[in-house]
């Protein structure tokens, strides 16, 4: 509704009525071959995360804060993958490259929100692991159901209010005649690069949001795991230390991939490297690989989730 009102009140600014998503730059002639692996990743992401939600919902033993966080991560994964993959597959299969301005800005906002939701959920999970390992006796009194809902409610409010500025500022730019985006989704930089007026405010806003949201999240995650590592190194029992590190390993692998790709994309964009395919491909993979990998990594590492999976699939 906000975007529609803004679109109507500023209709004179738009000389184009739609954008054209060109797909993967530099490989237009054979990019359709990417559709099969991308479709398989999307189906895997959907089925695996829906299965995680079913398991957590059905198994009373999994009605605990740690699994609530995992369920929230699964919902973010489903939302992120579904925001981009249907349109990408439509481009690759049916050459359906056009997207209205409103749809483009809505997709831009949804992508930012779901990525931020994943980031903030990783923060909550890192804090959960810190309390479980470093303050085990106080865990039941600190990490309660109330804490889970308050923490995620605060993060959702923070993300939605901060990130609404991204599509609003993009919608205020003047788009004169060029409407072809060398991308397969409506990225902020890809869209605003088509504007024929000063877009510095968009770039500044993007940098500020990256530092305040992603930067603060990453800082809290690093602090949490640094404190965990410090506590583990002080343990006298090698078995207990090994168990604690094993619990955190899967978290760290996924977090490392999540933030490393974001940093690489930012570097290639900010330095103006003449490799447009790389940031576009990384952007797409970053939005579909974690949703596919997250449930598998956590399910394989967690005994309770595996048992719940066997029950749901009637394997025991």
From Swiss-Prot:
One of its GO terms (molecular function) is G protein-coupled receptor activity. GO terms for cellular component: plasma membrane. The chain crosses the membrane at residues 33-53, 62-82, 107-127, 147-167, 204-224, 245-265, 280-300. Keywords: Cell membrane, Disulfide bond, G-protein coupled receptor, Glycoprotein, Membrane, Olfaction, Receptor, Sensory transduction, Transducer, Transmembrane, Transmembrane helix. Residues 1-32, 83-106, 168-203, 266-279 are extracellular. Glycans are attached at residue 10. It holds the Pfam family 7tm_4. This is Olfactory receptor 56B2. It comes from Homo sapiens. The gene is OR56B2.
């Amino acid at each position: 509704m906000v975007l529609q009102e803004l679109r109507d009140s500023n209709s004179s600014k738009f000389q184009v009525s739609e954008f054209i998503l060109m797909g993967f730059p530099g490989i237009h002639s054979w990019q359709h071959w990417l559709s099969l692996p991308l479709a398989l990743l999307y189906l895997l992401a959907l089925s695996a995360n829906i299965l995680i939600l079913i398991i957590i919902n059905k198994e009373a033993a999994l009605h605990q804060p740690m699994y609530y966080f995992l369920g929230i991560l699964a919902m973010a994964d489903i939302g992120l993958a579904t925001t981009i993959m249907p349109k990408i597959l439509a481009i690759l299969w049916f050459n359906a490259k056009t997207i209205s301005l409103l749809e483009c800005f809505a997709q831009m906002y949804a992508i930012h929100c779901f990525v931020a939701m994943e980031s903030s959920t990783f923060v909550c999970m890192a804090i959960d692991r810190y309390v479980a390992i470093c303050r085990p006796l106080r865990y039941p009194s600190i990490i309660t159901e109330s804490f889970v809902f308050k923490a995620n409610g605060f993060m959702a409010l923070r993300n939605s209010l901060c990130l609404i500025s991204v599509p609003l500022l993009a919608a205020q730019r003047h788009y004169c005649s060029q409407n072809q985006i060398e991308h397969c989704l409506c990225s902020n930089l890809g869209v605003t690069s088509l504007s024929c007026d000063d877009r510095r405010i968009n770039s500044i806003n993007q940098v500020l949001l990256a530092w305040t949201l992603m930067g603060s999240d990453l800082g809290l995650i690093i602090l949490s795991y640094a404190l965990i590592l410090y506590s583990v190194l002080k343990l006298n029992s090698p078995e207990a230390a090994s168990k604690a590190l094993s619990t955190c390993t899967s978290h760290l692998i996924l977090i490392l991939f999540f933030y490393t790709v974001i940093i690489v994309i930012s570097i290639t964009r900010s330095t103006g490297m003449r490799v447009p395919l790389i940031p576009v491909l990384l952007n797409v993979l970053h939005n579909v690989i974690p949703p596919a990998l997250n449930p598998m990594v956590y399910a394989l590492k967690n005994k309770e989730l595996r048992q719940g999976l066997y029950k749901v699939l009637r394997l025991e």
